[in-house]
């Protein structure tokens, strides 16, 4: 897998939305050749305020929002503001764009906990969304993230696009001047809190007339769809 364009979230707590928009860009480019930048603000503004307060997003909620509603091109929704302003912008303008965002959905996602599962996903061409604790003393030295775990600075979301003998190849959203041109190696022994496989492998559901999304294996999903077709005859 290759990295996508390096983005910069600035002072806005939109790391989850930045990573997800980059993943959608990856799928658009690899599947159709479409290299347009996708909107961070559309994903961030679609955050459900009833679930929690404060900045940022819960990864699972963000994944579900992108599965249901997708994303639009950056030019359609070019905002990167902090909440609650971002949510108000979305409520005013974002809902008008559902028809354009719907084709840019992910089809399914699943949480994984083993290194082998992460590597299998990457080999299949699926990026892996990740979250880890961030410390104030973290820095990238010779391309590798280092820390003494001093000064807890909250959680941070990025995405994994590969690996080597040193650790996971990770793309960040702090601009090209950060780390190794915006990327880094996260050592295998460094604590990662969450990892999610993000897939754009759409399976058609003939009953609902829309993509069938689940966390079942593809063979099982195919069997389900065959049964559905039989009962639809």
Per-segment meaning from a language model:
Residues 1, 37-42, 93-95:
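Short amphipathic alpha-helical segments, especially helix-boundary/capping motifs
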Residues 38-48, 133:
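Acidic/histidine-rich, metal-coordinating catalytic segments
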């Amino acid at each position: 897998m290759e990295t996508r364009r390096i983005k910069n979230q600035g002072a806005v707590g939109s790391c989850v939305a930045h990573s997800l928009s980059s993943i959608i860009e990856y799928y658009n480019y690899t599947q159709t050749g479409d290299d347009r930048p996708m909107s961070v603000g559309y994903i961030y503004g679609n955050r459900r305020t009833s679930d929690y307060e404060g900045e940022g997003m819960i990864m699972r909620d963000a994944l579900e929002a992108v599965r249901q509603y997708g994303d639009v091109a950056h030019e359609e929704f070019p905002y990167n503001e902090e909440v609650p302003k971002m949510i108000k912008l979305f409520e005013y303008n974002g809902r008008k764009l559902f028809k354009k965002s719907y084709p840019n959905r992910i089809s399914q996602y699943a949480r994984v906990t083993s290194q082998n599962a992460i590597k299998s996903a990457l080999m299949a061409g699926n990026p892996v969304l990740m979250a880890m604790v961030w410390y104030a003393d973290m820095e990238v030295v010779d391309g590798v993230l280092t820390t003494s775990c001093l000064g807890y600075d909250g959680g941070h979301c990025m995405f994994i696009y590969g690996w080597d003998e040193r650790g996971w190849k990770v793309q960040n959203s702090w601009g090209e001047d950060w780390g190794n041109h915006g990327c880094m190696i996260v050592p295998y022994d460094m604590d990662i809190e969450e990892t999610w496989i993000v897939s754009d492998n759409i399976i058609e559901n003939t009953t609902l007339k829309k993509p069938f999304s689940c966390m079942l294996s593809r063979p099982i999903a195919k069997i389900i769809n065959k049964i559905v077709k039989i009962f639809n005859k």
